[in-house]
Design a protein with these regions (language model features):
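Hydrophobic/aromatic residues positioned on beta-strands within the core alpha/beta folds
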Residues: 274-276
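An acidic, low-aromatic, low-complexity terminal/linker signal
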Residues: 1-239, 244, 248-257, 278-314
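Short amphipathic alpha-helix used as the core "switch/output" element in two-component signaling
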Residues: 256-269
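His-Asp phosphorelay/catalytic-motif detector in bacterial-type signaling
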Residues: 239-242, 267-272
């Protein structure tokens, strides 16, 4: 992995004995797309999840769980603040050794893609700032990871894997993919000779979007990050572009930078932008709309995405 010129600085050292502090720390950073919660797996490897997808952190032993007796990755279901929430073990999902239950300290309560999910982890370390330019795509090496980066923990540089949250959702809630395919069958072809430019680092999302675009009869180009999309603009005239669709959380260059760059160039003023992301909350939606996006669609609602495409294509 290449050495980075820009230092990744720790924002705060989490005190995992104090649940209230943990909740406050996550909440304070929930609108920043470059903030990640770092935790340790049973293998000693560090993993990370974007804080915008996290509602709060809970002490595992304090949560009453109706446990399943199956051998899959789902531990059971818990009533968390009035919401029945699926609880899974991160190590089991990722393929690591599963430790004794007493070794696990916290539940990361995530809410994205229209689902709440409690992710049981061994220990949380830090909230860190991870700029997109310091991330390297790692999905070819492990389909459950999106990027690899380095973070500073205890004055030492450590490798950190940012896992693919979309893949986790598809694995846990296996009806999502089926529903997306069923929704795609309802979609009709539309007539438009222009090209949709679509950027998303997740191979699973790109595959689903490709199926959607083919069903709609659209011309499209796909990119694994925002930088590749912007570089390709040198070879496409504005008159050829029907629409921009971008994820937010991507390596090298994220979706917010894509929006800002496009909106600074007046020749793209008449072309709409859809943000397709699991990272949206009310404050973030407002921020993206002010930055120049026309719509924010949550993953993985292919029907909603198709409707937005039909409405916003030029």
């Amino acid at each position: 992995m290449a050495e980075y010129d820009k230092e990744i600085e720790n924002i705060v050292d989490l005190d995992d004995d104090d649940e209230l502090d943990l909740v406050a720390l996550v909440s304070a950073n929930a609108n920043d797309t470059s903030q990640y919660l770092v935790f340790e797996g049973s293998d000693g490897q560090f993993y990370a999840k974007n804080v915008s997808k996290i509602e709060e952190l809970l002490v595992y032993k304090d949560i009453d769980i109706a446990r399943t007796h199956s051998k899959d990755l789902i531990i059971g279901t818990a009533d968390i603040r009035g919401n029945m929430t699926t609880i899974i073990n991160f190590d089991k999902w990722f393929g690591n050794e599963v430790l004794d239950d007493s070794e696990y300290e916290l539940i990361i309560l995530a809410h994205y893609g229209g689902h709440r999910l409690g992710i049981v982890v061994k220990r949380v370390e830090y909230i860190v700032n991870v700029p997109p330019e310091t991330m390297t795509d790692n999905s070819d090496n492990d389909e459950k990871t999106s990027f690899i980066t380095k973070v500073t923990i205890g004055q030492k540089k450590e490798m950190c894997l940012i896992f693919d949250s979309d893949k986790m959702l598809l694995d846990v809630f296996n009806t999502i993919d089926t529903k997306a395919m069923e929704d795609t069958k309802k979609i009709r072809e539309i007539k438009n000779d222009k090209t949709v430019l679509f950027a998303d680092d997740s191979r699973f999302i790109r595959k689903m979007a490709e199926s959607l675009f083919n069903k709609m009869g659209l011309k499209y180009r796909m990119y694994e990050n925002g930088q590749l999309l912007l570089e390709d603009l040198k070879y496409i005239t504005p008159e050829e572009i029907a629409l921009f669709i971008t994820d937010l959380e991507m390596p090298v260059l994220g979706g917010r930078d894509v929006i800002d760059t496009i909106r600074r160039d007046k020749k793209y003023d008449g072309i709409n932008i859809i943000v397709h992301t699991n990272m949206s909350n009310d404050n973030m939606v407002d921020s993206l709309l002010k930055a120049g996006a026309q719509d924010i669609i949550g993953k993985v609602n292919m029907l909603a995405l198709s409707e937005s495409i039909q409405k916003l294509m030029v």
